Regions:
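Structural signature of hydrophobic alpha-helical transmembrane segments
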Residues: 5-20, 63-75, 138-144
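Alpha-helical transmembrane segments and their membrane-interface exit regions
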Residues: 19-30, 46-50, 69-79
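Pore-domain transmembrane helices of cation channels
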Residues: 77-123
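Aromatic-anchored segments of alpha-helical transmembrane domains
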Residues: 2-4, 45-53, 108
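Cytoplasmic-side transmembrane-helix entry/capping segments in multi-pass membrane proteins
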Residues: 35-46, 63-71, 91-102
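Short, hydrophobic transmembrane alpha-helix segments
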Residues: 2-14, 27-35, 56-57
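Outer-pore turret/helix-boundary of cation channels
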Residues: 7-8, 109-143
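Pore domain of cation channels
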Residues: 136-171
Length: 171
């Protein structure tokens, strides 16, 4: 739903940033481990500070670092979810939701990694798209990430750089 809202709405980038930060904020409370809570809170605080710097009235932007912190936070959530998923042998609705959550976190991580690849190299995806190097590109990155996770791809968008191709094979 978010990519559709981002493409149609004039406030899609703001909504994307609010939702991404709220996911990372809610993840702080998804474990009972004190050290995981601390690491998650630190990563969230750094991510929030970097976003405020970028959207504030100053000339500085740490776009790549923001996404690297987002990837680190996503990896932490994957670790937390996998620990919860395999803690016992009981199959329940919570276990199924947890498995879907892991899958969606992999898609989010893939999209964030594509943003880093594009920001660092200037080339990531090709096809019938125009990438601007801004948050608006998330629509294409999450689409490619989800399609690569669920199928072998539709062929309308494809990886063109070596790092993006390696990521596509990982997904």
């Amino acid at each position: 739903v978010l990519p559709v809202i981002m493409e149609i709405s004039g406030h899609g980038v703001l909504l994307f940033n609010i939702l991404l930060l709220s996911v990372f904020f809610s993840g702080i409370f998804s474990t009972r481990s004190v050290w995981l809570i601390a690491v998650s809170a630190i990563l969230f605080s750094i991510h929030l500070a970097l976003r405020l710097i970028r959207f504030g009235e100053n000339p500085y932007s740490f776009f790549v670092l923001e996404n690297v912190i987002g990837i680190a936070n996503t990896l932490l959530f994957l670790f937390i979810n996998l620990r919860l998923l395999f803690r016992d042998q009981i199959v329940s609705a919570y276990r199924i939701v947890g498995a879907v959550n892991v899958y969606l976190l992999l898609a989010l991580m893939g999209a964030l990694m594509l943003e880093v690849i594009h920001a660092a190299t200037g080339v990531s995806l090709g096809g019938n798209i125009v990438l601007s190097g801004k948050d608006d590109d998330y629509v294409h990155f999450i689409y490619f990430s989800l399609v690569s996770l669920t199928t072998v791809g539709f062929g309308d968008i494809y990886a063109v750089s070596a790092p993006a191709k390696m990521l596509a094979t990982l997904l």
